[in-house]
A protein has these predicted regions:
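Bacterial N-terminal signal peptides that target proteins for export
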Residues: 2-10
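Boundary at the C-terminal end of the N-terminal hydrophobic targeting segment
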Residues: 22-28
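Extended, low-charge, aliphatic-rich alpha-helical segments
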Residues: 29-305, 417-620, 627-706
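Interfacial loop/beta elements and low-complexity acidic/Ser/Thr-rich segments
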Residues: 278-344, 361, 677
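N-terminal beta-strand/beta-hairpin edge segment
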Residues: 335-390, 561, 569-605
Length: 706
């Protein structure tokens, strides 16, 4: 029997593979056919126009047709070069037929076989003859884009309130930028523009607006283009970097090391910054820069903070079929959370199931009708979470009302007529009551969830999204998904000069209520986006630690001091076999009126132990304070080093013990989550927690007397 099952399983796998390949092949054929058609339409449109030869030469249409003839064996690098021409900012390329080719070209490139990691060295060497020279016209084009972006920002500033506009102008040195750009016939000082561009990355409210971001990006592009155009030996530097990458790729693929990741990331960043070897850059990042954070939260844990019983009383006062109804209604039921499988975003249903019991009196002329109604209530509120925040749909509700008529008060004859009329109109009245109840319930759910959605979005935007957008460090990938029983988050954090994770995370061995898998690259990359170049005072550090732990650290803020972080890798983590090394890098340190302006590194190494009831980190040796590049220290250096060691030993304690994880606010009542998984190796730190068992249900005794 086992052989039969195995045979059918094998057949199913083969059939699935064939169907998947057939689907991919059809997609490739469709993309190629679409590209051929759009190229033919472009050729017919160009025809014998006087500018047609220039367009064909610039867009490399002959090379494109040659690669189309190769089908799936087309050279991705050459196709990428053609795509770059169609995607450039050359005037006229916004016309419909050029746009059609560009769109089809992108689709076709996506269907071509991707480069493998072992092909990267060969690819780097093959890119050496393809240096893209930057001309003066390229510099002028980027300057025009910068001027246009500045004009739009100028308009925004003119429309803003005077006090706010003045604050923004001062923060980004607006007057200095205008002065640099106003110099007629002279190129602005590129170092000055580069310094101004950094100011647009400050965490100041408002700098996330499109107009500020556009100026920041245009400044970066213009400065990079102008620098490359004025470079004395761009070919030598370009070929040297490609040779270095070809040498480093194999060792990094076999045994990824953080030093190699930093080296490769910087070289790829240089190529990307100056628009060189785009296909190599894309292929290298695809192979060696993968998501570096995976988060999973179980439905059961989410329900522990959301699910609740409902017991509410409200007055009834409405008119149904001409009868004024007054009384009270009591809603009892339960609010529960239900995850909906979704690959595009996190889909969450908030469900309300219960019933409403009402006791009311209906008034219609001389008649009074006493009744009791029971309404079943089922309401659904859909929430969706993606990289822009939390959104919601209007709640829907289904209600069904059944009434039981009690006594009818009126004169004898009138009561008889009223009773017959009540029985006749009862189904219609119940239908009206059901519809109105559904509308009220849905409206109440929407009203109550409005503050929840608004607060969640404010927290997400103010504490995460907007600060990173302002500093140009929002994750390249932030994906939310839901399954039947878990919410999953996948994130890739890497800047232009950085790599993320080189490999997949360790597998989760079991089911957890909360699981985090973090690559060491996340610490360095995220810290650069958040803390690069930032000055942190002792007061602010104490506040941050208090926010995280609930209590202030002792001895950290006794004497006034501050540290200004390095712009690159201000904090770095290394995760090896049950060992974690944390390094803090600064470029300026102050103590009261004393100051040193030189690189300093503060580091500590911990061994990590998973014990049955807790996790323990034990520091190996002392906290290390180093001044890179300095062999001899001055008296001031020695005194400052001693002071720093004293302060950071408070932060890097000899032993750190965690007996569980306490969640905030609504989840605090469930108790501490117990750490069940701890893996620290090969650059990854994996943690998994389980919530404590729910307390045993207590029996409710009902007493009655006779």
């Amino acid at each position: 029997m086992g052989r039969v099952y195995f045979r059918w399983f094998s057949i199913a796998v083969v059939m699935f593979a064939q169907l998947a390949w057939a689907r991919f092949a059809r997609a490739a054929d469709t993309a190629e056919a679409e590209l051929r058609q759009s190229v033919q339409e472009l050729e017919r449109w160009l025809g014998n126009d006087v500018q047609a030869p220039g367009w064909r030469k610039f867009l490399k249409t002959d090379q494109l047709n040659a690669e189309l003839g190769k089908g799936a064996r087309a050279d991705r690098g050459l196709v990428r070069e053609v795509l770059d021409r169609f995607a450039s900012n050359a005037p006229g390329l916004e016309r419909r037929r050029f746009v059609a080719v560009r769109s089809a070209l992108k689709k076709w490139l996506d269907t071509l076989p991707a480069w493998r990691a072992e092909q990267l060295p060969e690819m780097a060497r093959a890119a050496k003859p393809h240096l893209v020279l930057v001309t003066e016209s390229d510099v002028k084009r980027e300057r025009a884009r910068l001027d246009a972006a500045v004009d739009k920002l100028r308009q925004l500033l003119s429309e803003a309130k005077q006090e706010q506009a003045a604050s923004w102008k001062e923060a980004v040195k607006w007057a200095q930028l205008e002065s640099e750009l106003a110099a007629a016939g002279a190129q602005p000082d590129l170092k000055t523009l580069l310094a101004i561009e950094e100011l647009y990355r400050q965490d100041i409210a408002g700098l996330e607006q499109d107009e500020f971001v556009a100026v920041r990006q245009a400044l970066d592009k213009y400065v990079c283009t102008a620098l490359f155009a004025s470079s004395a030996e761009p070919k030598k530097v370009y070929e040297g970097f490609l040779d270095e990458l070809a040498e480093r790729f194999p060792s990094y693929a076999q045994n990824p090391q953080a030093e190699d990741a930093i080296f490769i990331g910087k070289r790829l960043g240089w190529l990307d910054r100056f628009g060189q070897a785009r296909e190599l850059v894309a292929a290298a990042r695809s192979s060696h820069s993968r998501p570096n954070l995976f988060l999973e939260v179980s439905e059961a844990l989410m329900q522990a903070g959301i699910d609740q019983n409902v017991d509410e009383t409200a007055a009834v006062n409405e008119v149904i079929l001409g009868t004024r109804i007054r009384g009270n209604a009591r809603l009892t039921g339960a609010v529960t959370l239900d995850l909906v499988p979704s690959q595009d975003n996190a889909a969450i249903n908030i469900l309300l199931d219960g019933s409403t019991v009402s006791n009311s009196v209906g008034y219609n002329g001389p008649v009074r009708v006493f009744s009791r109604g029971v309404t079943s209530v089922n309401a659904v509120k859909r929430l969706q979470l993606d990289d822009t925040g939390l959104s919601d749909r209007r709640a829907t509700a289904r209600c069904s009302t059944r009434t039981r008529i009690g006594r009818v008060e009126a004169g004898h004859l009138v009561r008889h007529i009223a009773t017959k009329r009540i029985q006749k109109t009862k189904p219609q009245a119940e239908a009206i009551a059901s519809r109105r109840a559904a509308g009220r319930i849905a409206g109440n759910v929407d009203d109550r969830s409005a503050d929840l959605v608004q607060d969640a979005n404010a927290s997400f935007s103010d504490k995460f999204r907007l600060p990173l957008v302002r500093r140009g460090g929002f994750p390249q990938l932030l994906q939310f998904r839901t399954t039947d029983d878990a919410l999953q988050v996948t994130m890739l954090q890497a800047g232009r000069d950085q790599l993320a994770a080189p490999n997949a995370p360790p597998a989760l061995t079991g089911k957890f209520d909360l699981a985090v898998r973090m690559h060491e690259s996340l610490v360095g990359n995220m810290s650069q986006a958040v803390l690069g170049g930032v000055t942190l005072t002792d007061v602010r550090l104490v506040e941050m630690i208090k926010e995280l732990t609930g209590k202030p650290p002792e001895g950290l803020g006794d004497d006034p001091w501050s540290i200004t972080f390095q712009s690159e890798l201000p904090i770095e983590a290394r995760f090896t076999a049950r060992t974690a090394k944390i390094t803090i890098r600064g470029k300026r340190f102050t103590r009261e009126d004393q100051e040193i302006r030189r690189p300093v590194e503060i580091s500590a190494v911990y061994t990590i132990e998973k014990l049955p009831d807790r996790a323990r980190l034990v520091r190996q040796g002392d906290v290390q304070i180093d001044f890179p590049g300095r062999q001899k220290l001055s008296t001031t250096d020695i005194a400052m080093k001693s002071f720093m060691k004293k302060k950071f030993e408070v932060l890097f304690k000899p032993e750190i013990v965690s007996e569980g994880l306490t969640l905030p606010k609504r989840w605090a009542s469930i108790g501490k989550l117990k750490l069940e998984l701890l893996v620290c190796d090969k650059g990854w730190l994996a943690l998994g927690w389980l919530k404590p068992p729910a307390p045993a249900a207590t029996e409710t005794l009902v007493a009655s007397s006779r």
